[in-house]
Amino acid sequence: MKLLFIAAEGAPFAKTGGLGDVIGALPKSLAKNGNEIAVILPYYDVIDQQFGNQVKDLFYFYTNVGWRHQYVGIKEMIRDNVTFYFIDNRDYFFRGHIYGDWDDGERFAYFQLAALEAMEKINFIPDVLHVHDYHTAMIPFLLKEKYHWIQAYQKIRTVFTIHNIEFQGQFGPGMLGDLFGVGLERYEDGTLRWNNCLNWMKAGVLYADRVTTVSPSYANEIQTVAFGKGLDQVMRMESGKLSGIVNGIDTELYNPENDPHVTFPFSINDLSGKAKNKKELQEQLGLPVNENIPLIGIVSRLTDQKGFDILVSELESILQQDLQMVVLGTGYQQYEEAFRWFANCYPEKLSANITFDIGLAQKIYASSDMFLMPSAFEPCGLSQMMAMRYGTLPIVHEIGGLKDTVEPFNPFDKTGTGFGFNHFSGFWMTNTLLFALDIFHNHKEDWQAIQKNAMSADFSWDTASLAYEKLYMDLKLF
């Protein structure tokens, strides 16, 4: 199959979160199966700085963004049997960052128009076109309402993936004519309208042939008032074409046997290196060195979504237990200051690292005994899967992708890959943590069995990509 991905970011070129990880890994995995894969990304200044000497200039053309006649440079790079095309316009994409500008609507309107017009010029007409999040959500609409006259485009099937429904791309309706060059008919009849705004994500859901999210549970949750962020009625209406596929992780990168950030390699059959890594991390962070004290890791953005409101409210009580905790991340000032304060009060129990350090993150995944992830909502989540690869048992709120990837330990039949709580509250989070501490201290055989279950779970992209491939094949035959 010929498959084309269009997205606002993709690792290793430009990445701010899970979307970048998916675009970096899924196309590569699909290419292994013999598919012809291409990806179109904006050419940001960060890409120019790191990969500028590796990309090749192909050609340029101009596109109309409303009344604006804008330059479109096309660059190319082949990596892991995937052809990456980059849309180059320095006015729009050389900003020192990917998102957050006042004219993001114009920037990504331009990108979508340029990407659609580039398909014909680079002679890559896909069987399936896969777009991601609101930044490219207007593409299925544009294919059917603006570019339907291009014969080569008429058989293209589209997939739209929602990585986080919270960010929907809501703009003034005048953008339809001013930027996209189409009429207001689909806004005035309510198709593209939500809350008296033009809603890009709603357009993607209604016009794509299939809609996916990044876990089955999240696909169900966004059909509810609690998690649909206002689009729950639309999601219920389109539920027949909605499905959830759990993201994978790069199991070659997150491998305790050869991770370059991990001093002492270990495996599912020999966990002795994990204890040595724990000792090294305790020394590095200035915590008392004691392998019998459970070490709880947290690598996260410090926000309400990630559950830090309930964690901070319980932290005083938690730190009375015989444990150590290491926190790595940045976020809301109130949580950054709270962790600094508790680390100052409990220097032998809490290490607060208010920064982001990939090397330290890997050490935390590899060296901790438990990984705390009490998210209020989590479309998929990758950290819990990374932790399990290293035998670090996750303690999670059973929501979204956390529910789909972590099986809570059952003391009766000894199954499970971690620990979970159903009700989003500090009380239930703390109770679950206390249960995990009891297993760690008093049931060593059970603990080791859970570790082996977690380390043997299959979270590879090669497995996840098979589900996408089936979806694409069903669409192609449709």
Curated annotation (Swiss-Prot):
Recorded hits in InterPro entries, A to Z, give: Glyco_trans_1 (IPR001296), GS/SS (IPR011835), Starch_synth_cat_dom (IPR013534)
Q: What is its EC number?
A: 2.4.1.21
Pathway assigned to this chain's UniProt record: Glycan biosynthesis; glycogen biosynthesis
SUPFAM superfamilies linked: UDP-Glycosyltransferase/glycogen phosphorylase (SSF53756)
Q: What are the alphabetically sorted keywords of the record? A: Glycogen biosynthesis, Glycosyltransferase, Transferase
GO BP field: glycogen biosynthetic process
One GO molecular-function annotation for this sequence?
alpha-1,4-glucan glucosyltransferase (UDP-glucose donor) activity
Q: Which residues bind ADP-alpha-D-glucose?
A: K15
Catalytic reaction equation(s): [(1->4)-alpha-D-glucosyl](n) + ADP-alpha-D-glucose = [(1->4)-alpha-D-glucosyl](n+1) + ADP + H(+)
The record describes the protein's role as: Synthesizes alpha-1,4-glucan chains using ADP-glucose.
NCBIfam families (UniProt xref): glgA, PRK00654.1-1
What protein is this chain from?
Glycogen synthase
* UniProt gene name: glgA
